């Protein structure tokens, strides 16, 4: 084990995965290689991917324990209170983001998220988790983060939901924004963001974006069906062609 306040990192053996364990008094007066007292373990963080596990271990060695505790509290809230299913990588990405956000705040650097409006509109549930996160940062660390940071947290949550990279998540968000604008302008209508139809449309766009940016597009084997739709809804079909060309 390696001491770091109330936290330590343990390597079981060459075949076992690396884990981070947290608990009061863990690592106190301990020596490298010493067996950990199981009764002191309050939480075990285990990342199955070896690369992510190593990155996570190095990250928590240099950060205050409070950052990891805070990250765990936010993730637990998203899972248990909201019911989100998140990839294990969220422990690494969220803890790292919280660290940088607090560092920016302490340096007096204002962060402006260019996708804040889109995140609030297209990912309201995840944005709610982001607002919970900045509230907890304020309560626990007396650090006042803005809604732009809440939007960034939300993007990390979305990334963990769909198991895509942050860059892909941002690309998907931009795609949704642009397609919504194309539909609104081409059909000369104002989309009702509170409607069930709008929610379904956004959901379809999310999965479309995910397939596009992960290279998992579906085949186009039914041209007959497309012709039927074009005949029944010529204006809407023309709009979809404009989107396809985009």
Question: Which ranges hold each PLM region?
Answer:
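Short, small-residue-biased leader/transition segments that mark boundaries at the very start
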Residues: 5-9
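SH3/SH3-like beta-barrel fold
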Residues: 10-13, 21
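A short macromolecule-binding patch
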Residues: 17-30
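Ordered, amphipathic secondary-structure segments that act as subunit-interaction surfaces
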Residues: 51-93
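General marker for long, soluble alpha-helical cores
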Residues: 68-80, 104, 108, 120, ...
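Short, recurring structural edge motifs at helix starts
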Residues: 77-86, 119, 134-144, 185-191, ...
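Extracellular/lumenal glycan-associated surfaces
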Residues: 88-103, 148-162, 199-211
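Small-residue-rich helix-loop
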Residues: 172-189, 194-212, 217-232
